[in-house]
Amino acid sequence: MNPIVEFCLSNMAKGGDYVFNQLENDPDVDVLEYGCLTHCGICSAGLYALVNGDIVEGDSPEELLQNIYAHIKETWIF
């Protein structure tokens, strides 16, 4: 069982696509995309993804990727 990272298509258009593609190449992470994750306020303010249901944000695609991996490392129990 891998950690699940979910992306909103609107947020991917803002730079989240870079993070999505990086994670998609990681066999230890499951990546999903949705039309909307219903976090419109956060989505309009910047980059974010849901990591096992938790909101993880970043000011740049690189920072978001770094924060996602940090969150997985801190919270993943498998």
Curated annotation (Swiss-Prot):
HAMAP family in the record: UPF0349 (MF_01542)
Name listed for the protein in its UniProt record: UPF0349 protein SAOUHSC_00876
Source taxonomy: Bacteria, Bacillati, Bacillota, Bacilli, Bacillales
Pfam families in alphabetical order: DUF1450
Similarity field: Belongs to the UPF0349 family.
InterPro entries registered for this protein in UniProt: DUF1450, UPF0349
